[in-house]
């Protein structure tokens, strides 16, 4: 368990002792998931075995012990915890702690999925994998509210800030990938409605939150809106050195959200396919990129004119199948390690 401000000096309590600012217990798990992402980009099995798996194993087994059954449904939920950093109204009062908030459930689902994926790749099947798989099947997952939005909590609760800067409950769409247009289009619609609702209710933007929203819009295939948000971030939050201001100081999340969004406008690889120019903004009608990495250990150079691809060069670092998708058409390449392919 680690709050989002836990650091090398063992600062452990919720930020300023406010539950809605720091009582979220899956933040360390979010960081752990980067181990599996590193493997997906490199296919480095030695890294997977010696670095990623030990971390994923400990994290997954912790949550197997942490989860408890929801007495209403029997499904497993995390808690008590808060959905960073939103609050809700109940019985005329403001509260923040609950059981099974969407943010926690999505990150725990990803943790279980990544651990089981790593074990499958390494040929591991034992009591621990069986236990984790059983818990994963019993997880309570978010549902859609009566107004069509993705629910932030297990009940339909009225948030205190409709335009709250955090979009924690949309984690499963971005940076997670449980929610995709290919497999869960109904949830994608709910994510879009949730995001539109926030943006249309006097959205309380910070530099880092604008970065997250910019990336979310790119993944939602809304390129022009993503670019508008990116430019708004630059003109209102950027410092002269390109750091992004948040509460009078730069934060690392501020600087990473926008570059990620720029990449996702041009290339996305979080599904079974590698999508080329999936969210290209109208203003970027002509362009060229080199050295873009994709999951599966592929490196892309691309050029486009008038919004259309005119050349694509793919270098395969490890070999294997490469599934490309462009304008709804799918092309499968069988590649060899170290070779390049020009389309």
What kind of feature is each model-predicted range?
Residues 9, 13-45, 50, 101-273, ...:
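Active-site core of glycosidic bond-cleaving carbohydrate-active enzymes
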Residues 35-60, 65, 69, 78-84, ...:
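Primarily short, surface-exposed interaction patches in extracytoplasmic proteins
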Residues 58-118:
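Acidic/histidine-rich catalytic neighborhood
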């Amino acid at each position: 368990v680690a709050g989002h401000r836990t650091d090398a000096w063992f600062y452990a309590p919720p930020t300023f002792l406010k539950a809605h600012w720091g009582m979220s217990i899956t933040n360390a798990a979010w960081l752990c998931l980067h181990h599996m992402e590193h493997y997906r980009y490199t296919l480095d099995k030695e890294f997977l075995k010696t670095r990623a798996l030990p971390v994923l194993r400990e994290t997954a087994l912790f949550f197997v012990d942490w989860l408890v059954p929801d007495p209403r449904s029997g499904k497993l939920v995390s808690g008590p915890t808060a959905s960073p950093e939103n609050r809700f109204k109940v019985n005329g009062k403001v509260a923040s702690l609950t059981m099974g908030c969407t943010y926690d459930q999505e990150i725990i689902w990803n943790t279980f999925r990544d651990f089981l994926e790593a074990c499958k790749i390494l040929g591991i099947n034992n009591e621990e994998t069986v236990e984790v798989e059983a818990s994963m099947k019993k997880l309570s997952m978010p549902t859609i509210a009566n107004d069509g939005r993705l629910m932030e909590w297990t009940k339909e609760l009225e948030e205190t800030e409709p335009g709250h800067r955090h979009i924690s409950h949309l984690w499963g769409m971005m940076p997670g990938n449980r929610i995709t247009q290919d497999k869960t289009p109904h949830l994608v619609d709910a994510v879009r409605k949730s995001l539109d609702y926030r943006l249309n209710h006097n959205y309380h933007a910070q530099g880092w939150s604008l970065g997250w929203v910019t990336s979310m819009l790119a993944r939602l295939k809304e390129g022009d809106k993503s670019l508008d948000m990116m430019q708004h971030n630059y003109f209102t939050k950027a410092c002269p050195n390109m750091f992004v201001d948040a509460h009078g100081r730069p934060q690392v999340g501020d600087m990473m959200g926008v570059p990620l969004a720029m990449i996702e406008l041009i290339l996305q690889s979080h599904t079974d396919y590698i999508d080329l120019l999936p969210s290209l903004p109208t203003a970027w009608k002509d362009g060229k990129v080199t050295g873009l990495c994709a999951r599966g250990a592929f490196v892309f150079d691309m050029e486009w004119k008038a919004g259309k691809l005119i050349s694509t060069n793919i270098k395969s670092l490890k070999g294997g199948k490469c599934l490309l998708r462009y304008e709804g058409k799918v092309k499968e390449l069988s590649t060899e390690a170290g070779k390049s392919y020009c389309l």
